Amino acid sequence: MKARAKEWLMPFFSGFWGRLRRRGGNMSLADITFINMCKDILENGTSTEGEKVRPKWPDGTPAYTIKKFGVVNRYDLSKEFPILTLRRTALKSATDEMLWIWQKKSNNIHDLHSHIWDEWADEDGSIGKAYGYQLGVKHQYKEGMMDQVDRVLYDLKHNPFSRRILTNIYVHQDLHEMNLYPCAYSMTFNVTQKKGERRLTLNAILNQRSQDVLAANNWNVVQYAVLVHMIAQVCDMNVGELVHVIADAHIYDRHIPIIKELIERTPYPAPKFWLNPEVKDFYQFTRNDVRVDDYVTGEQIRDIPIAI
C-alpha cells in the first residue's frame, strides 16, 4: 500500500507547482496543510491491513487504514479562515454541529439540522453520555456551579492569563454509556498579548485521539476555527492560532483513490470569513451568524463510504 502511494505521488508533486504558478501563486494555506498531511500519511504512514480493527464497512469488511501518529497542524486564524477550497466544506452544517455540542450541550440528534449522527443514536435519538452531555455537566468551583463551557468563558473574561482554561469530554467513568467515544475530546485555550496591540489574542489547541482524514479533517478544523472566532468575539479578543493535534490521523483503504484525486487538484484563494459582529453573547450565536464570501472550490465529492 505504501509503495503504491509513493509511485503516484512523485509525478503529482512535480506538476503541482506548475499548475499553481499558472493560477497566480495565490492559494489557501489550509489546502497546503491538507495536501502535505495527506502526502505524509501516504508516504510515511503505517498500514493496519491484516490487524484486528474495530471499524467495518457497511458490507462487513474490516476497514483498514494507512495511519500517521502525532500529526500537528497549525492554522493562523488572523491570516485566513482554514476552510478547504479543494472541495467544499459545508460551513453552516459544521457550525450547527459545533453549536449542538458547545452551546446546546445536547446529546440528542433531534436537536441537529443534519443526519450525520444517526448511525450512533438510539431509538430516542440519544448518543448517550457523549460530547455535549459532558460539556453540560455542572461542577463545583469556588465561584459557584458551572459547566465546562461557562468555566472557559468565565476564566477568559476574568483571568485570561490562566494556564488552566480547558475542556475535556473523555470522561472514563462514563465511557460505557457513550454510543461513540469522543474523537475530538479536549480544547485548551491560551491568551497572549501581542506587542503594540490593545486587545488580547485568543489561541487554542484541539486534541483529537483519532481522525478520518477524508471525511472529518477539514470539518473539524472549520468547526473549531468558528468556535475560536465566536469565543474571541464575546471576550473582546483577537483570534490567533488554532493548533490541531491528532494522535491517529488515518486514511481508510477505500478512501485512498479519492484522496489521490483530491490532492491533485489546484487550490483556490482562501475565502473571507464573516461572523455577525452584533452577537456579544456566546449563547445567542446561530449557524446563520457565519458566512464565507468569495468561496470558490473544486467539485464536491459525494457518496464517500463511511466506516462504522
Positions of predicted regions on the chain:
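Terminal, non-catalytic protein-protein interaction segments that mediate quaternary/complex assembly
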Residues: 20, 24-308
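Targeting/processing segments of secretory and organellar proteins
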Residues: 3-4, 10
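Accessible peptide chain termini
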Residues: 1-2, 27
